[in-house]
Amino acid sequence: MSIWAIGDLQGCYDATQRLLENIRFDPSQDTLWFCGDLVNRGGQSLETLRLVYSLRSHSVVVLGNHDLSLLAIAVRSEEEQRKVNPDLLRIITAEDRDEILTWLRMQKLIHVDRTIGWMMVHAGLAPKWTTQMAEKLAHEVEQQLHGADYRNLLHSMYGDKPEWSPALSGCNRSRAIINVLTRMRYCTPRGRISTEDKGTPGTQTQGMYPWFEVPGRVERDLKIVCGHWSTLGLTITQGIHAIDTGAVWGGKLTALQIDTDELRLAQVHGLSIEHPRHTHTPRRQAKKHSKK
């Protein structure tokens, strides 16, 4: 049995299929961990979503910011829905949309497997959040998303503020938790997120740090695998394994086997487009699997 964590798919269906062939995925014994952002930009979001849905008995999904945006679009008026990009509109108008989107809404914001010592989150954790605290806070939002009043959450989750504080309540608290778990790249030691800084480390605003390098951050008892930050590139450092390698931007789609002591890496080429972006060299290289 193998457990493979897979970076942001973003509607890159063909690349996803090639990657599953590359790792010789066997649904009878293997498990896939999808790091979120299954949809948007890749042009085949409906096909990608259907594929992951078909693998639901053999996979775990955490929601990314694009997945949450899709769910929010689905509860808007038809007039507003017509304004979204064609890739997402195909999902909204699909015959099986209710079945697929209900399944998507029931997914987690954080997944933990303490038997192998790993946590999966789309973006990151606030500096003072232990893994136990992050699980608890994620569960708060998941309960709302899975409940009867989920539309209220989807309507109120947008906005860059407030910054996280334990004293927050209501929609402000939920929004702050969602922003940390699905949107964060850089933050201050106090946990204030920068939504403007999206480039490689060294290009950010003064006083901002990559979330996994913030001074004074708590020690964590689990290894973490995440996606979201394509300009960071493959980065393995201090128990953090960032595997969004920009498949939708002409980069690669990455899978990382996490149930063995020696990490194994598999990659396939993503979309054949050029997108101006910086690269970031991994600080520790995982063992490479065969490439296609």
UniProtKB/Swiss-Prot annotation:
Catalytic activity: P(1),P(4)-bis(5'-adenosyl) tetraphosphate + H2O = 2 ADP + 2 H(+)
Superkingdom of the organism of origin: Bacteria
Basic residues bias locations: 277-292
GO molecular function: bis(5'-nucleosyl)-tetraphosphatase (symmetrical) activity
Keywords: Hydrolase
E.C. code: 3.6.1.41
Transmembrane region(s): none
InterPro entries: ApaH, Calcineurin-like_PHP_ApaH, Metallo-depent_PP-like
Matching SUPFAM superfamilies: Metallo-dependent phosphatases
Residues of the signal peptide: none
Ranges for region Disordered: 271-292
Pfam families for this protein: Metallophos
Protein family (similarity comment): Belongs to the Ap4A hydrolase family.
Role, per record: Hydrolyzes diadenosine 5',5'''-P1,P4-tetraphosphate to yield ADP.
Name of the protein this chain belongs to: Bis(5'-nucleosyl)-tetraphosphatase, symmetrical
Organism in which the protein naturally occurs: Xylella fastidiosa (strain 9a5c)
